[in-house]
């Protein structure tokens, strides 16, 4: 993923990088304080299907959906919930004790596991909450994991 950001930076002459875990969550929350930045009918998990690609075809997709298939969030960002987990720049940590307070990525010399945020099309909708986090091996590949880059202005 970092190689892609470096390639894109070289190709365009603009600086691209992977998001930190904190940046990814900030973008997913889009100014909201609750677990979801969109209406969620408790007990009716599939109300999320109007806002994100999650488990089952109630959202119109059996697997991944095309980018922009659901409305953007309050920040104007698309697809922050569901579809695929997003690999972020941070190494996996199972807690926040010692995490950078400036929003930068929490790195180690060598990441045995990487941090992934969001959720994928094969998981129950409850995992679409803005704070959902998980881990993956750096070698993991599949139709359930992707990444997002940021362009520095």
What label would you give each PLM region?
Residues 1-134, 138-143:
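Functional-site microenvironments in short loops/helix caps that host divalent-cation chemistry
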Residues 143-153:
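Short, structured beta-strand segments at or near domain termini in extracellular proteins/domains
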């Amino acid at each position: 993923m970092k190689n892609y950001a470096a390639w894109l930076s070289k190709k365009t002459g603009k600086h691209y990088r992977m998001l930190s875990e904190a940046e990814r969550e900030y973008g997913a929350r889009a100014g909201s304080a609750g677990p979801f930045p969109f209406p969620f009918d408790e007990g009716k998990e599939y109300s999320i299907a109007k806002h994100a690609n999650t488990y089952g075809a109630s959202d119109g997709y059996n697997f991944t959906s095309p980018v922009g298939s659901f409305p953007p969030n309050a920040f104007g960002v698309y697809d922050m919930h569901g579809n695929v987990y997003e690999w972020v720049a941070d190494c996996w940590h199972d807690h926040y004790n010692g995490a950078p307070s400036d929003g930068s990525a929490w790195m180690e010399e060598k990441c045995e596991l990487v941090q992934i945020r969001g959720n994928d099309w094969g998981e129950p909708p409850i995992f679409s909450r803005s704070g959902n986090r998980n881990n993956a091996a750096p070698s993991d590949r599949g139709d359930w994991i992707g990444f997002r880059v940021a362009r520095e202005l």
